[in-house]
Amino acid sequence: MTTLTAQQIACVYAWLAQLFSRELDDEQLTQIASAQMAEWFSLLKSEPPLTAAVDELENRVATLTVRDDARLELAADFCGLFLMTDKQAALPYASAYKQDEQEIKRLLVEAGMETSGNFNEPTDHLAIYLELLSHLHFSLGEGTVPARRIDSLRQKTLTALRQWLPEFVARCHQYDSFGFYAALSQLLLVLVEGDHQNR
């Protein structure tokens, strides 16, 4: 990632964490199709590796705006993909992909973080990884903690996430017939890969 700042990358991770943690409400649905969001997407597309993934997400958002009962349909997609059994779903948990669910707990402790009691999901949920990455990128931008320490923890987090994210994304593509969450997951995968290469 060359054109995006640490804070901008942190914002993308925080935004993705929010979208993968719960169904979109009416306000989020309006926001994702707003002119402000179009500007944000344009900024993300200035990073060449993200361009195709953002284009696809914009296509899904455009289709979403003309979808009947868009919020209800998207909520059904979210539920079917992320809350059902793993037979025809893309469960957003490291443990669903035979990964060590304790790894994220160790990473959170190392970062001096803990999960919120308001988030009623297991600690190995995708959103927790993304919130941690967001926190680490914000910390890099602040310069209060040695960058080497933050970067080491960022790489550990990315490595742990990369163990199962490709399979999660493949399952999103396989089972998300509308394609919004498939496009969102593809953007996440490209972001994580670019972030990992930016050592």
Swiss-Prot record:
A Pfam short name: Nitrate_red_del
UniProt KW Lyase keyword: no
Keyword Magnesium: no
Domain of life: Bacteria
Gene3D superfamilies: 1.20.120.1820, HscB, C-terminal domain (1.20.1280.20)
Compartment annotation: Cytoplasm
Any GO BP annotation: protein folding
GO cellular component, one term: cytoplasm
Keyword list, A-Z: Chaperone, Cytoplasm
NCBIfam families: PRK04976.1
The family this protein is said to belong to: Belongs to the TorD/DmsD family. TorD subfamily.
Function noted in UniProt: Involved in the biogenesis of TorA. Acts on TorA before the insertion of the molybdenum cofactor and, as a result, probably favors a conformation of the apoenzyme that is competent for acquiring the cofactor.
Protein name (record): Chaperone protein TorD
